[in-house]
Amino acid sequence: MKKIEKTLDEWRSMLDPEQYQVCRLKGTERPFSGKYNSERRDGIYHCICCGLALFDAQTKFDAGCGWPSFYAPIEDSAMIEIRDTSHGMIRTEVTCARCDAHLGHVFPDGPPPTGLRYCINSVCIDLRPRD
């Protein structure tokens, strides 16, 4: 997969302020505030920055954590996992494999079949109908 590389100024001009803060500066939207937290429509969730397909809506579940949660990415190659020791915690950050956008974190407390919970910021994703 060909990487997309832009300067922070280029990303800032493409994204709204909240998208920029979360995707490019590794921020976090407030829990229960994101437009996809309670979303139930079918489709594919794509990276808001580069359009890469990230999650199938059929893998979304209600974790009660305040952010959209998925038990698996659409392809393992769509994500990069990075050890995150910020805020006095040890977590695993997930970023878009194509543009390095911060998406959220993955935790080992999800449902079968993976046992994983990809906790994703709504501002980082875009739900599109299936082709």
Swiss-Prot record:
Keyword Zinc among UniProt keywords: yes
Any one of the GO BP annotations: protein repair
Cofactor: Zn(2+)
Assigned keywords, A-Z: Metal-binding, Oxidoreductase, Zinc
UniProt feature coiled coil, ranges: none
Cofactor binding description: Binds 1 zinc ion per subunit. The zinc ion is important for the structural integrity of the protein.
Name of one Pfam family that matches: SelR
Annotated catalytic residues: C119
PANTHER family documented for this protein: METHIONINE SULFOXIDE REDUCTASE (PTHR10173), METHIONINE-R-SULFOXIDE REDUCTASE B1 (PTHR10173:SF52)
Record protein name field: Peptide methionine sulfoxide reductase MsrB
UniProt source species: Pseudomonas putida (strain ATCC 700007 / DSM 6899 / JCM 31910 / BCRC 17059 / LMG 24140 / F1)
